[in-house]
């Protein structure tokens, strides 16, 4: 009996030992699948899509920084609200109409090549022909000032038209994210990936996009050093700022060509014929009209509250962004200096967004929807109030003490404004977007589809365009006004907007709980 027991013990322990490596391997495989869920046979497809996305997003971040640098330092930060409402919005509608026509007449692959090539051709023309000769091409400062004196209420429109090439560059650069990324890239990727693949691919794409922001920021931060190196290496005679614009847009052109080549390889070498048969760019399904959107929002309190969140976010961010950019021009007076400043801001935005991505899912899972949803308005409100307090009352005793630390009082407002933008954008890309999408989940199918379309159309458009229109209206009525002079007024609108936002989150939480309970 004893021998048998010993034998059985020995057998049991041997069996345990045999199983241990198997269990460890299983755990390692599980962990590696969690960190890197891409299968071997999908690797080339994933890497090529990733490279294409990287090129498009890197371009997006470079031209976003460059357009702000040129317009704020060479025309004025106040003109941004005019460009957003009177320039970008009509051109976005025009671009959508052109795209619908192309979809009905051309092959999907050729649409991509045509649109990206037009963007790149304009950037090349701007870098090497328009910007170096902008003084010849633009209206003379004397003529512009004479026109402003005779038509003071149209001051900002005259400034934008007198420097038409800078305004045009801003509009084209603003169209890139909507056309190249949201439309061309995502339509292509959604057509060639299965639902099962998307669950594993898309989270990694999200992480990559933030890495792209960080790297673009680092490049812009070091722009002046790159500029100096290029001048020394090639003995160039071009002006410092012209060279900065040319360096940025040369990188844009190189990345654009790499992107086109990557797209071609995906179409002809990587994807099989079965995938290619699925590739058809589609004109968006008939979107709801503004009247239909209003009707949908008015019929559902749940959707009304989601739309309120989107409107409040858009207004609050734009109210702080304008005065912050205007304050930054006091210190960063040239396009090169301003681009380096924006680069620093982009680097921090990328790093903090990655942090929020890691923390975000845990906050929702452990603390619930309300806690995750209220974090973004709290961040926007506290940092925004701090910025306005510093910007409006920078002569107070506390700020004099702080100015010894930062050497220049104007830097205090700029630094707090940068912190406000970094934290607000980081939490928006993660917590705000995810909780907003979660709020649709418990609704019934019809309200979910139509309600989302209505809230996205009205909420996003009213948030961005509404804020830009209000600000441009103030500058039309008061042509001598600047962001500094109307900052106190903007602060009160900002406070009211954030209070409505807090109320909407609280009320939406009640609606969300009711809908979840009802759907179970």
Curated annotation (Swiss-Prot):
It is found in: Cell membrane. Its main location: membrane. Disulfide bonds: none annotated. The chain crosses the membrane at residues 43-63, 80-100, 111-131, 166-186, 201-221, 240-260, 305-325, 339-359, 370-390, 399-419, 462-482, 485-505. It comes from the Bacteria. The keyword ATP-binding applies. Provides the rickettsial cell with host ATP in exchange for rickettsial ADP. This is an obligate exchange system. This energy acquiring activity is an important component of rickettsial parasitism. Belongs to the ADP/ATP translocase tlc family. This is ADP,ATP carrier protein 4. It comes from Rickettsia bellii (strain RML369-C). The lineage of its organism: Bacteria, Pseudomonadati, Pseudomonadota, Alphaproteobacteria, Rickettsiales.
């Amino acid at each position: 009996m004893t021998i048998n027991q010993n034998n059985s013990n020995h057998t049991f322990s041997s069996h345990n030992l045999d199983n241990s490596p198997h269990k460890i391997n299983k755990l390692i495989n599980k962990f590696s699948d969690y960190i890197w869920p891409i299968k071997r046979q999908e690797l080339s497809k994933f890497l090529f899509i990733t490279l294409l996305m990287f090129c498009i997003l890197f371009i997006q971040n470079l031209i976003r920084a460059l357009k702000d640098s040129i317009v704020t330092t060479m025309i004025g930060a106040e003109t941004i609200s005019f460009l957003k409402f009177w320039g970008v919005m009509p051109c976005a509608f025009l671009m959508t109409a052109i795209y619908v026509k192309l979809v009905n007449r051309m092959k999907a692959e050729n649409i991509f090549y045509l649109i990206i090539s037009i963007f790149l051709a304009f950037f090349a023309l701007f870098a090497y022909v328009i910007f170096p000769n902008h003084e010849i091409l633009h209206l003379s400062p004397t003529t512009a000032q004479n026109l402003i004196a005779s038509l003071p209420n149209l001051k900002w429109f005259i400034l934008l038209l007198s420097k038409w090439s800078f305004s045009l560059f801003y509009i084209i650069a603003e169209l890139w994210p909507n056309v190249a990324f949201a439309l061309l890239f995502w339509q292509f990727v959604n057509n060639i990936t299965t639902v099962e693949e998307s669950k594993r691919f898309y989270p990694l794409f999200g992480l990559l996009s933030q890495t792209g922001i960080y790297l673009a920021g680092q490049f812009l931060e070091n722009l002046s050093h790159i500029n100096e190196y290029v001048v020394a290496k090639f003995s160039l005679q071009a002006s410092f700022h012209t060279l900065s614009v040319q360096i940025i847009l040369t990188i844009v052109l190189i990345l654009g060509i790499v992107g086109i080549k990557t797209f071609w390889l995906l179409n002809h070498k990587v994807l099989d014929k079965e995938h290619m048969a699925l590739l058809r760019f589609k004109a968006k399904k008939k979107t709801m009209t503004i009247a239909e959107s209003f009707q949908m929002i008015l019929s559902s309190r749940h959707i009304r509250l989601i739309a309120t969140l989107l409107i409040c976010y858009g207004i609050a961010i734009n109210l702080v962004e304008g005065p912050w950019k205007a304050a930054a021009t006091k210190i960063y007076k040239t396009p090169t200096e301003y681009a380096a400043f924006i680069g620093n801001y982009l680097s921090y935005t990328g790093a903090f967004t990655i942090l929020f991505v890691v923390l975000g899912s845990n906050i929702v899972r452990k603390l619930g929807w309300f806690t995750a949803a209220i974090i973004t308005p709290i961040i926007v409100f506290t940092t925004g109030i701090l910025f306005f307090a510093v910007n409006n009352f920078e002569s107070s005793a506390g700020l004099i003490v702080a100015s010894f630390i930062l050497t220049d009082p104007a830097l205090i407002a700029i630094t707090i404004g940068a912190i406000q933008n970094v934290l607000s954008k980081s939490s928006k890309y993660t917590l705000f977007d995810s909780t907003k999408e979660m709020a649709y989940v418990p609704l019934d199918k019809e309200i979910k589809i139509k309600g989302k379309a209505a809230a996205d159309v009205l909420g996003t458009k009213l948030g961005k365009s509404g804020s830009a229109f209000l600000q441009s209206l103030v500058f039309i009525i008061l042509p001598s006004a600047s962001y500094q002079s109307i900052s106190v007024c903007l602060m009160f609108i900002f406070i009211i907007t954030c209070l409505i936002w807090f109320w909407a989150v609280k009320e939406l939480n009640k609606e969300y709980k009711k809908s979840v309970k009802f759907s179970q």
